[in-house]
Amino acid sequence: MGWSNFRDGRCKSNIHEDVPGLACINKLKPVTYKLEVKKLDQFLGRKDSLMNTMQPGYAIAEKKIHTGFVAQDVEKAAFELHYDFDGVNHPQNDKDNYSLVYSQFVPSLVKAVQEQQLLIEELKKENENLRHSVTALQASFEKLKK
């Protein structure tokens, strides 16, 4: 059984369909990066004895390439959209770090797909109308040629 979050509608109020879709997704900057694990441990104030024990693992961990987002970039994108996004965990003090809750990106991704689908449907209609116009123009042209 996978991870689940409490989402029962019977215990929710003040529900609004105001999640930004494409506007939010288009502001995000997917990146690849190497995590500086030792630097993170130092920043978080991990004890030297623990860091010495973990020393052999640092080199391996720091070679791995990760894919994701920079939390501060996500925070900036949400701020620019006036979106109170709950997918960014902000530092609680000067020795805490930013983190992201990737599952909270799903509503914006769903909204973006819905918005794209509406655009696709509009373009299909426009394309069909243009095809009819071209067919009518071709028929008129053929009549003029005779």
Question: Where would I find each of the regions flagged by the language model?
Answer:
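Acidic, glycine-rich loop-and-strand cores that form catalytic or ligand-binding grooves
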Residues: G21-A61
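C-terminal intramolecular chaperone/auto-processing assembly modules
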Residues: R46-Y58, F85-K146
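Small/polar residue-rich beta-strand/coil "junction" motifs that cap repeat-based extracellular fibers
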Residues: M1-P20, L28
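Active-site rim elements
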Residues: R10-N14, Y58-K64
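Glycine-rich, acidic and aromatic/proline-enriched surface loops and short helix-turn segments
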Residues: K27-P30, A71-D84
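Short aromatic/basic micro-patch
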Residues: G68-F69, S99
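Stable alpha-helical elements in mature extracytoplasmic
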Residues: D18-C24, V70, L109, S133
